[in-house]
């Protein structure tokens, strides 16, 4: 079990501790406002079940998840409506349950509820969930989600894989999203919901403690629930044997540290084979937060059973083996779709990604994404049959069915590196950041990819086997709010027949549209 050391004076009703007991696959899910102080600084937040991060939702491969989201939000300084995105799930046949506001649904009104009811027949691994309405998840509505596989091919290589081996990394903001600047700097790195602020005047807050027993092997599931910051992650004195990337099994790859971007996940096996002691867990942010580890910032503690209850004195590896995406290879079905050559696809798209300084907006092919007032899915169900008929104009791309798509995402837009996420799919990264070569044989497969820095031209491939409108966007939430997104309307003619919508979904828009703007 995780052990959290804390001063009760800094905790309001225990709300900043992550719930240790997982919930699901069938559950009510209350979204509430409450005060939390994960770094000793108290603020009002938007919380799932009253805790940050939200509780672990868990189930098994093949489960039917029925998550009844109950909106009890009342704080007018933050959004009162909400939606939830279940990040990484294909939602085949349930596009209406994917969650992005005004793409797949209207928001849930305060005082109302909505049942997300979806099957997970062929996926397992590490996922997460978060609000997908404006920048609401930066105010706290985010948490981990795990689907266990009883036939996991790595099952015999670890002894422990449970609630206690999930590690969340978050950036934390002392100011509510709607009250701050468009591109705020985070105040604190939180590991499993606890951390220390690096600014002058911040209290010395307690750190998360992850307990291990010498001799045991642990499958840790590392989840970036970040709004912006990416993190360089390591555990002093221990190597990380990576076996899963964004809910896809990969060939084992042993490293000392890895960089994880907003929305990404890794599973790694850690063998507790060092002396019984305390070891620093490090998550150094790339942007927005005070970097380094002075005073225990950006840190947590790996504590062996029997070790003294003290902070570690360990040091980082001086020449670490660093994870490179180019070295990751899927365990099965490794080949990229299409022909193993440049242009060997049915449709190739090249996006021009830019930032417009005067407007403080991002653009894809010259267009800033502005959410429509009618969800894209509802537009399709109401008869729109081409991209030209769909709003927002210039931001919807129609994709044919049963086709292989290649998408190039050249870096260079201000504020990078930008992590891009495609809903409804995993994709093959045939050209990762930092590489000038293409790998069609066994490229990493994932659902969030960093597009790197100026000069990079990250290229991905996927098959259109999932009818519906699917969001593609930068997972830095401030950048999404500034228009860094498009919608892929996949196989428009089959959307309605493949994705029958429940009546409660149809009721969402009339209820939302009747709200006063102050209740949004």
Curated annotation (Swiss-Prot):
Positions that bind Cu cation 2: 87, 130, 475
CC per GO annotation: extracellular region
Residues given in the record as Cu cation 3 binding sites: 132, 423, 473
EC number: 1.10.3.2
Chain positions recorded as Cu cation 4 binding sites: 418, 474, 479
Keyword entries, A-Z: Copper, Disulfide bond, Glycoprotein, Lignin degradation, Metal-binding, Oxidoreductase, Repeat, Secreted, Signal
Keyword match Protein transport: no
Glycosylation sites: 75, 352, 402
Catalytic activity field: 4 hydroquinone + O2 = 4 benzosemiquinone + 2 H2O
Source taxon at top rank: Eukaryota
GO molecular function: copper ion binding; hydroquinone:oxygen oxidoreductase activity
Cofactor note: Binds 4 Cu cations per monomer.
Coiled-coil spans in chain: none
The keyword Membrane is assigned to this record: no
A family per Pfam: Cu-oxidase_3
Names of required cofactors: Cu cation
Compartment annotation: Secreted
SS bond list: 106-509, 138-227
Residues that bind Cu cation 1: 85, 421
One BP term from GO: lignin catabolic process
Family: Belongs to the multicopper oxidase family.
Known function: Lignin degradation and detoxification of lignin-derived products.
Protein name, entry field: Laccase
Source organism: Phlebia radiata (White-rot fungus)
């Amino acid at each position: 079990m995780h052990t959290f050391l804390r001063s009760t004076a800094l905790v309001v009703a225990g709300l900043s501790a992550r719930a240790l007991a997982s919930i699901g696959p069938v559950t009510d899910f209350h979204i509430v406002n409450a005060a939390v102080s994960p770094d000793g600084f108290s603020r009002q937040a938007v919380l799932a079940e009253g805790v940050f991060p939200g509780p672990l939702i868990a189930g098994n491969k093949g489960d039917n998840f029925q998550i009844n989201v109950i909106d009890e939000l009342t704080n007018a300084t933050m959004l009162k409506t909400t939606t939830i995105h279940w990040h990484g799930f294909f939602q085949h046949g349930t596009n209406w349950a994917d969650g992005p506001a005004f793409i797949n649904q209207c928001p849930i009104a305060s005082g109302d509820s909505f049942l997300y009811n979806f099957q997970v027949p062929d996926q397992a691994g590490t996922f997460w969930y978060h609000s997908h309405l404006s920048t609401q998840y930066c105010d706290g509505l985010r948490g981990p989600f795990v689907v266990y596989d009883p036939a996991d091919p790595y099952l015999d290589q670890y002894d422990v894989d449970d609630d206690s081996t999930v590690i969340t990394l978050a950036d934390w903001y002392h100011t509510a999203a709607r009250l701050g600047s468009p591109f705020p700097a985070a105040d604190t790195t939180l590991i499993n919901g606890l951390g220390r602020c690096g600014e002058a005047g911040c209290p010395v807050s307690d750190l998360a403690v992850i307990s291990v027993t010498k001799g045991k092997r642990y499958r840790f599931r590392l989840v970036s629930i970040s709004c912006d910051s990416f993190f360089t992650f390591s555990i002093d004195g221990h190597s990380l044997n990576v076996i899963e990337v964004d809910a896809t099994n990969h060939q084992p790859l042993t490293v000392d540290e890895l960089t994880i971007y907003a929305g990404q996940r890794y599973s790694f096996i850690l063998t507790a084979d060092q002396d019984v002691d305390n070891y620093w867990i490090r998550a150094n942010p790339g942007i927005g937060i005070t970097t380094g580890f002075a005073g225990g910032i950006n840190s947590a503690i790996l504590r062996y059973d029997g070790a003294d209850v003290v902070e570690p004195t360990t040091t980082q590896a001086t020449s670490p083996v660093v994870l490179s995406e180019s070295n990751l290879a899927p365990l099965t079905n490794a080949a990229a779709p299409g022909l193993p050559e440049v242009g060997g696809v049915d449709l190739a798209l090249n996006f021009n990604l830019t930032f417009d300084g005067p407007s403080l907006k991002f653009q894809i092919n010259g267009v800033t994404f502005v959410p429509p007032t009618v969800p894209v899915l509802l537009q399709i169900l109401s008869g729109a049959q081409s991209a030209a008929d769909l709003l927002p104009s210039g931001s919807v791309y129609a994709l044919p069915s049963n086709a292989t798509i290649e998408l190039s995402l050249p870096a260079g837009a201000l504020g990078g590196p930008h992590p891009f996420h495609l809903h409804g799919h995993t994709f093959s990264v045939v050209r990762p950041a930092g590489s000038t070569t293409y790998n069609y044989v066994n490229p990493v497969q994932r659902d969030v990819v960093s597009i790197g820095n100026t000069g990079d031209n990250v290229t991905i491939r996927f098959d259109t086997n999932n009818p519906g409108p699917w969001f593609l966007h930068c997972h830095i939430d401030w950048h999404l709010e500034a228009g860094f997104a498009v919608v892929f309307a996949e196989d428009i003619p089959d959307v309605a027949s493949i994705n029958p919508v429940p009546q409660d979904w149809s009721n969402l828009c009339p209820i939302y549209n009747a709200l006063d703007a102050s209740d949004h």
